[in-house]
Amino acid sequence: MQTNSVICADALTVCVDDRTLLDNLNFNVGKGEVFALLGGNGAGKSTTLKTFLGLMKASSGSATVLGHNASTQPNQLQKSVAYLPESVTLYGHLSGVENIRYFLSVAGVDKSDDDMFAALRKVALQEDSWNKALSNYSKGMRQKTAIALALLRNAPVLFLDEPTSGLDPAAIDEFNALVSELAAGHAARSR
């Protein structure tokens, strides 16, 4: 592992039964860098994320986040990593604000309403929708709520699985700009 790496795959191999899902994967991601895994269905993108989150174990090699081996120290990752899965479970009978409050309390994260509102503005979710039930939200609005929730974790590492799913082209551009802004902020703090 390189000493300046925040995320490191070192000869990472993951096998399930007799199938090799990842084979000798190697990469390093430094602080403030944006890194994307691209590939078709079955290429191993979600398997890679699950391995770095400690949800799947490496068969050989290692997956480390902030120096913690994801296979042997998964509990060490919980406060260091925020994860936005491809399909986020939010409660349709609760409003966007109520969902965020609930999931932050479950995670033990204490945030003020001002912090929450700032995150919702940052992801460009219209204010008139914040207190409406999620059952009235479009898929894109639900995704923006989930992104705001992930941002509120203030974790040094943010894993995103298909984060722009359900967003229109303008919202995708806004999201990409937001990710660049977040990465630049982390890079500036590391100097």
Stretch-by-stretch model annotation:
Residues 7, 22-24, 78:
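Conserved structural motif at the start of ABC-family nucleotide-binding domains
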Residues 38-40:
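The feature captures the beta-strand-to-loop junction immediately N-terminal to the Walker
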Residues 61-72, 76-77:
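Conserved ABC transporter NBD signature motif
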Residues 101, 105-108, 113-129:
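Conserved ABC ATPase "signature" region
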Residues 147:
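Hydrophobic anchor residue at the start of the ABC signature
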Residues 158-162:
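Catalytic Walker B motif of ABC-type/P-loop ATPase nucleotide-binding domains
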